[in-house]
Regions:
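Mid-to-C-terminal alpha-helical segments outside catalytic/metal-binding sites
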Residues: 1-35, 49-104, 108-115, 289, ...
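Acidic-and-aromatic substrate-binding clefts and catalytic sites of carbohydrate-active enzymes
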Residues: 102-107, 131-137, 159-165, 187-194, ...
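Histidine-centered divalent metal-coordination motifs
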Residues: 40-46, 213, 249
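Conserved, mostly hydrophobic/aromatic
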Residues: 40, 117, 172, 180, ...
Length: 340
C-alpha cells in the first residue's frame, strides 16, 4: 500500500493524490470513485429575519470558511487548519452576517454546492437546517429551495422549545424532510433536556433519523462546548431505541467516547466529517462498517477534504470504501443502491 502525503501548501495540491486532478482550477475526482452521498452539508443560515439570499443563485466562486489557499493538514481535526483571522471572519459571517444578504454566506447556495458535487462524483448531499425556537425558518426555506432537485436531501429542524412540535415535524415531513438536525451548541439546549427527549420520540414514531452535532470542537463558546459533551448524548440514545441517531463529526474531539456509544447501541451511526486520516482509520477498524457515513460540513470545508481522507484510509479496501461513501447512507435515507 502506497504512502500518501497528508500535508499540502493549499487545497489544490490535493491533486497530487492519485484520485484527484485539476480541471479549470477546480478539484475533480476520478469518476470511478463515485458515487458518494455527503450526509453533512449546510446552506447559508438566516436568523431573526427571513433569508434575503437567493439560495438558487450560482456564484463564480464558493467562499468556504476554510479558504482554498490555506495550508492543509489532513491528519489533524479539520478546524485546526483555520488561522485566527479565518475564525474571526467565520464568526462574523455566522452571527452578524446571518441577517444580511452579503458576506461569504451569499455563495453558500444550491448551485455552488451542486457544482462541487459534480466534480467529485457526489450524487446526493444532505442539507442540515438549524433553527431556533423563534425567529428562524431555515428548514422551510431550504425545503422550498430544494424542491424538484433530487440531488438534495433536506433534514429539517424543529427546536424542542418551539410550540406544537409534533405539528411542525408533520409539516416538514409533508414538505419532504427526510430527517431532523439537532445542534445543541447552536440551539442552546442539552441533548437530554425533557423537551428534546420528546422530540426524539416523535422522530422515531415518524421514522425520521436525528443527526446530532456531537462533541466539542474547541472553537465554540464555553456553554456550547458544555452542551456538546458526548456524555450528554447517552441518555437520549439509550431511552429512544426506536429512533435512529447519527453522531455528526463522530463525537468531534471526544471520538473515543462516541465510538463506545456506537458499539453499545445499534441505533447509532457515525458521520466522519472533520476527523483526521488517523481517526478515520480508527473508525473503520473499530465501528460496525455498516454504520459509518461520509460527510463534509460544507461550506465550512471543501468536499474534497474528507473525500481525500477517506480515500487514503480505505486504500485496498474497496468494498468498505463503497459502503461508507454511498451504500450505508443510501440504505438509511431510502435512496437507490449503487450499481457498483
Amino acid at each position: 500500500m502506497a504512502e500518501h502525503p497528508t500535508q499540502f501548501r493549499d487545497h489544490h495540491e490535493l491533486a497530487k493524490l492519485p484520485w484527484f486532478d485539476l480541471e479549470g482550477g477546480e478539484l475533480v475526482v476520478d469518476p470511478s470513485i463515485g458515487p458518494a452521498i455527503d450526509v453533512h452539508t449546510h446552506l447559508a443560515l438566516s436568523y431573526v429575519l427571513p433569508t434575503r439570499l437567493d439560495l438558487n443563485r450560482e456564484w463564480p466562486r464558493t467562499e468556504h470558511y476554510l479558504p482554498l489557499e490555506r495550508p492543509l493538514d489532513l491528519d489533524v481535526y479539520a478546524n485546526r487548519n483555520f488561522s485566527a483571522e479565518d475564525l474571526k471572519r467565520l464568526e462574523k459571517d455566522l452571527t452578524l452576517g446571518a441577517v444580511t444578504a452579503s458576506g461569504m454566506r451569499r455563495t453558500h447556495t444550491l448551485p455552488n454546492l451542486a457544482r462541487e458535487m459534480r466534480g467529485l462524483s457526489i450524487k446526493s448531499s444532505v442539507l442540515l437546517a438549524i433553527d431556533f425556537a423563534l425567529l428562524s425558518d431555515n428548514a422551510g426555506e431550504w425545503l422550498a429551495a430544494a424542491r424538484g432537485k433530487p440531488e438534495f436531501v433536506v433534514f429539517g429542524s424543529v427546536h424542542p422549545y418551539r410550540p406544537r412540535v409534533a405539528a411542525q415535524l408533520d409539516r416538514q415531513l409533508a414538505l419532504g424532510a427526510r430527517g431532523i438536525k439537532v445542534h445543541p451548541a447552536v440551539q442552546m439546549i442539552l441533548p437530554q433536556d425533557p423537551l428534546a427527549m420528546r422530540l426524539y420520540r416523535l422522530c422515531g414514531e415518524r421514522k425520521l433519523p436525528v443527526l446530532f452535532h456531537c462533541g466539542p470542537v474547541d472553537i465554540e463558546p464555553p456553554l456550547g462546548r458544555y452542551f456538546s459533551q458526548v456524555r450528554h448524548y447517552r441518555r437520549p440514545i439509550e431511552k429512544n431505541p426506536d429512533t435512529t441517531f447519527v453522531l455528526g463529526h463522530s463525537g468531534a474531539l471526544q471520538m473515543e467516547v462516541a465510538i463506545e456509544l456506537c458499539k453499545q447501541n445499534p441505533n447509532v451511526y457515525m458521520e466522519i466529517s472533520s476527523q483526521s486520516v488517523s481517526n478515520v482509520r480508527k473508525l473503520l477498524d473499530e465501528v460496525d462498517p455498516t454504520r459509518l457515513l461520509f460527510g463534509s460540513d460544507w461550506p465550512f470545508y471543501h468536499q474534497a477534504i474528507p473525500l481525500a481522507k477517506l480515500l487514503i484510509a480505505t486504500e485496498g479496501r474497496e468494498e468498505l470504501r463503497r459502503a461508507v461513501l454511498y451504500d450505508n447512507a443510501a440504505r438509511l435515507l431510502g435512496l437507490a443502491p449503487s450499481a457498483a
